[in-house]
Amino acid sequence: MAELTINADDVRNALNEFAASYEPGNAERVEVGRVTTASDGIARVEGLPSVMANELLRFEDGTLGLAQNLDVREIGVIILGDFTGIEEGQEVHRTGQVLSVPVGDAFLGRVVDPLGVPIDDLGEIKAETTRALELQAPGVTQRKSVHEPMQTGLKAIDAMIPIGRGQRQLIIGDRQTGKSAIAIDTIINQKANWASGDVTKQVRCIYVAIGQKASTIAAVRQTLEENGALEYTTIVASPASDPAGFKYLAPYAGSAIGQHWMYGGKHVLIVFDDLSKQAEAYRAVSLLLRRPPGREAYPGDVFYLHSRLLERCAKLSDELGAGSMTGLPLIETKANDVSAYIPTNVISITDGQIFLQSDLFNANQRPAVDVGVSVSRVGGAAQVKSMKKVSGTLKLELAQYRDMQAFAMFASDLDAASRQQLTRGARLMELLKQGQYSPFPVEDQVVSIWAGTNGHLDDVPVEDVNRFETEFLEHLKHKSSILTTLAQTNVMDDDTAAALKSSIIDFKKGFFGEGDNHLVGAGHEAHDAISEGEVDQEKIVKQKR
């Protein structure tokens, strides 16, 4: 048998040749983790030492998960889907991708889930690209001050709490006080801008529904479709039946879709309905991940949850395309308590709040905006000049009216000036009432507010103020060019005011009966004028309830 010999030079040469031809890129490293526990939409996974925060993981049955807690021995994973098929011991693989959603104009008119998957049975969506959910908000130098108006079509808001493009305006109030109605009216009011075809005017809208009933979301979609607003709106839906992880991610998915348009130089309006339910979902997820609870059992970073979301709404500088994203977050309060944890957090983050009062809503004052508590911190710079001029004294007059109304409940007799304040205040409150899904063009609002603040409605009975307003606006549309002039110039000058005064005097001649102070219209009978003695005896008496 021949003796086996090893030549050291041959071994050395073979190793050198292998090292020279070796390409590290051809080697593939695969990390595999295993599920240790899975329940309540949360899985704990051992292994995967190189996993990234917010990386997508894939379970054996194809379900995706989101890596959250990166502990030394295991990972806390939010399961994005049905967790019933995930069991202990199953393999988990990395995808190497952070959570992102598809974006693009193809999403307009569609209803998608928080992962960007269509759920409206209208086929697949061809996305232009994808965008990560966790993105840094624009910095200070990338922004521009808010200076363009975002019209809601609601007189009470556009006159006293104006909103600008790029602003974050909180809508806060108890349940069933009309919060969603204001947001939907604002979306519907963008129809004229969309129909104009002018990119600088058009506003793409995103409605993020968090934790609502599926029937409610379907009703919102139908309302938008009936009013011609669905074609420029995307609905991101995470109904109450969704896992808590989906409700937590839905607002970020909506903002990612909006940011794509904003950085493309377009204008976006995004509605978060509502962030109270997102905070509750995040609390549930955090407690299941065994994170330390804080005040009201919310995790310590619940402020950061909302701040990093709302800071993405901005008016970009001209160098970045001058696009904007306006945010309307909604918060539900309990018993009108705005001093609770989540409401105070979001109030401190946003640029103002619209507070809806349940007492006003129940008194049929809708929209039920409490003007005394509501404020817009930056929207005043974006208000059109004509509206700023006519509404300058409106907030003060309403405040004086509320004070006098409280005083009149206990006073048996009032002087003429006090009665005048009550007369005008009651008519201004009636003027601010507005039906749902019937937003007003800004020029119509200017004329209505002008008529109220200048005393032209003082001789109109309160119950006929809305009819007077409707018929006067129709009169102007058919017999005057004042509305067209206001729409084009947005300026209420002396000539326009004089023409308006002349028009309203002429209109009253046909609207009022001859020689008396009562209206004669459809369903109204003429009466004799009240004598001066009877007027002097007018008293305001507190009504017993």
From Swiss-Prot:
The keyword Translocase applies. The keyword Membrane applies. Keywords: ATP synthesis, ATP-binding, Cell membrane, CF(1), Hydrogen ion transport, Ion transport, Membrane, Nucleotide-binding, Translocase, Transport. It is a peripheral membrane protein. ATP binds at G173, D174, R175, Q176, T177, G178, K179, S180. Its EC number is 7.1.2.2. Gene3D superfamilies: 2.40.30.20, ATP synthase alpha/beta chain, C-terminal domain, P-loop containing nucleotide triphosphate hydrolases. Its main location: membrane. Produces ATP from ADP in the presence of a proton gradient across the membrane. The alpha chain is a regulatory subunit. NCBIfam families: atpA, PRK13343.1. F-type ATPases have 2 components, CF(1) - the catalytic core - and CF(0) - the membrane proton channel. CF(1) has five subunits: alpha(3), beta(3), gamma(1), delta(1), epsilon(1). CF(0) has three main subunits: a(1), b(2) and c(9-12). The alpha and beta chains form an alternating ring which encloses part of the gamma chain. CF(1) is attached to CF(0) by a central stalk formed by the gamma and epsilon chains, while a peripheral stalk is formed by the delta and b chains. This is ATP synthase subunit alpha.
